[in-house]
């Protein structure tokens, strides 16, 4: 939020990232858009790169793909794409896309399968990606990006 101190209008985040998560955080001055993008009924996908210690068996990734039972209920199926196994450094890297917005959901899902998250980075929300944007940097959306977000939010 410190990055936006000079902004002439009030802006607020669409969703949140926990303290140990980095990556894309959409900021807006449009309350209706924010509310609709955050509401689970709109099923807005958020994609993360996850790094966990150890080599995750395919069966464990498959559990994430069908949904897992957390203390606050069953999760919706997630899209999971294996990026790499590093046998030498003993970690697994994968993408996971979810459309729910439960507190620390990706971390809790990984805990459930027995592979706690070491690093977590949100790389995409709906049609927006952080490609080409350095850590701690921000930019305004293009008119096309905003129109696509409004379409996703059904505005």
Each predicted region: which residue ranges?
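Basic, flexible Lys/Arg- and Gly-enriched helix-loop patches that mediate nucleic-acid binding at interfaces
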Residues: 1-155
């Amino acid at each position: 939020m410190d990055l936006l101190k000079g902004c002439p209008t009030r802006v607020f985040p669409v969703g949140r990232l926990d303290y140990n998560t980095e990556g894309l955080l959409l900021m807006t001055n449009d309350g209706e858009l924010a509310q609709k993008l955050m509401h689970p009924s709109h099923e807005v996908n958020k994609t993360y790169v996850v790094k966990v210690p150890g080599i995750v068996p395919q069966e464990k990734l498959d559990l994430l793909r069908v949904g897992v039972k957390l203390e606050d209920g069953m999760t919706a199926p997630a899209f999971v794409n294996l990026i790499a196994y590093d046998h030498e450094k003993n970690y697994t890297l994968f993408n996971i896309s979810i459309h729910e917005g439960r507190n620390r959901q990706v971390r809790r899902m990984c805990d459930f399968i027995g592979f706690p998250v070491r690093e977590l980075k949100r790389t995409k929300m709906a049609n927006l990606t952080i490609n080409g944007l350095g850590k701690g940097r921000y930019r305004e959306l293009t008119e096309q990006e905003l129109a696509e977000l409004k379409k996703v939010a059904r505005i």
